[in-house]
From Swiss-Prot:
GO terms for molecular function: 4 iron, 4 sulfur cluster binding; ATP binding; ATP-dependent FeS chaperone activity; metal ion binding. Heterotetramer of 2 NBP35 and 2 CFD1 chains. This is Cytosolic Fe-S cluster assembly factor CFD1. Belongs to the Mrp/NBP35 ATP-binding proteins family. NUBP2/CFD1 subfamily.
Length: 298
């Protein structure tokens, strides 16, 4: 099985689309690699694979090796910087064109997910993050059944559930938490995404969608609340254009001053994980990642 060398498997779930689940998956991966862990991302959102674009590796192709597929390298480990390696696998790498639609019925989706779990040959990996489709569909059932059958005892660490502050999103995520209960998947915690907006021109962070819905839901279900993540236009520019984030004087996120100092010169050189260190959200996700590691026991 392709998961033999994987220590911990973490599912990233959401009750509905549009809550930024793939963004959370990407930033968890970047945060974990920054902490020195070797990380893999398996994108099983078959009809909307966005991980290749998030990681700026859309042009990459999967390599066939004896026994299966080798995941795509995002960046190598660098012990001198305390950086772990990052690999990814997605159906997006297998499509002839980026805009090609995946029009598959349930059985074909189920077969593809099982093939991903069995035939993608991960090297020594501390954490494998599985980016799932929104809701509780055939893909989720197939994923849970295959992991229960093939994963070793304790290998599936649990799930991180993503929501936004609005009531309509938290209502759908309640179904996801119930799904975890029925499939015996431990909930590592809830992330409230899009909780505030960091203005690119000043230091103000505004709760345009409200706040607190994710924390209230976590308390209701007696599961850990991992933290709130604001929206940051600089993070989007980093993913879309490769721009290193910079912030005006007085910008604070989570009580931390992340202003770009006037005497500081930031070049546009470096890979994604290097530039992400200058993003306001890297500080937010460091706290979230620390809580996830404690809950996993890693």
């Amino acid at each position: 099985m392709g998961l033999t060398k994987v220590k911990h498997i973490i599912l990233v779930l959401s009750g509905k689309g549009g809550v930024g689940k793939s963004s959370v998956t990407t930033q968890l991966a970047l945060s974990l690699t920054s902490a020195g862990h070797s990380v893999g991302i398996l994108d099983v959102d078959l009809t909307g694979p966005s991980i290749p674009r998030m990681l700026s590796i859309e042009a990459s192709k999967v390599t066939q090796v004896p026994g299966g597929w080798a995941p795509v390298l995002v960046h190598e480990a660098d012990e001198s910087k305390g950086l772990g390696s990052l690999h990814a696998m997605s159906l997006g790498f297998l499509l002839p064109k980026r805009g090609d639609a995946v029009v598959w019925r349930g059985p074909k989706k189920t077969a593809m997910i099982r093939q991903f779990l069995k035939d993608v040959l991960w090297d020594e990996t501390d954490y494998l993050l599985i980016d799932t489709p929104p809701g509780t569909s055939d893909e989720h059932i197939s994923l849970a059944e295959t992991l229960q059958k093939d994963a070793t005892l304790g290998q599936v660490a649990g799930a991180v559930v993503v929501t936004t502050p609005q009531a309509v999103a938290t209502a759908d995520v309640r179904k996801e938490l119930n799904f975890c209960t029925k499939t015996n998947i431990r909930v590592l915690g809830v992330v409230e995404n899009m909780s505030g907006y960091v203005c690119p021109h000043c230091s103000e962070c505004t709760d345009i969608f409200g706040s607190g819905g994710g924390k209230s839901m976590a308390e209701e279900f007696n599961v850990p609340f991992l933290g709130s993540v604001p929206m940051d236009a600089q993070f989007i520019a980093l993913l879309e254009e490769g721009q290193r984030p910079t912030y005006p004087s007085g910008t604070t996120v989570g009580g931390k001053d992340i202003s770009t100092k006037e005497t500081e010169t930031r070049t546009q050189e470096g890979n994604l994980v290097d530039k992400y260190q200058d993003c306001s959200l890297s500080h937010v996700f460091k706290d979230i990642t620390d809580k996830v590691l404690v809950n996993v026991g890693g």
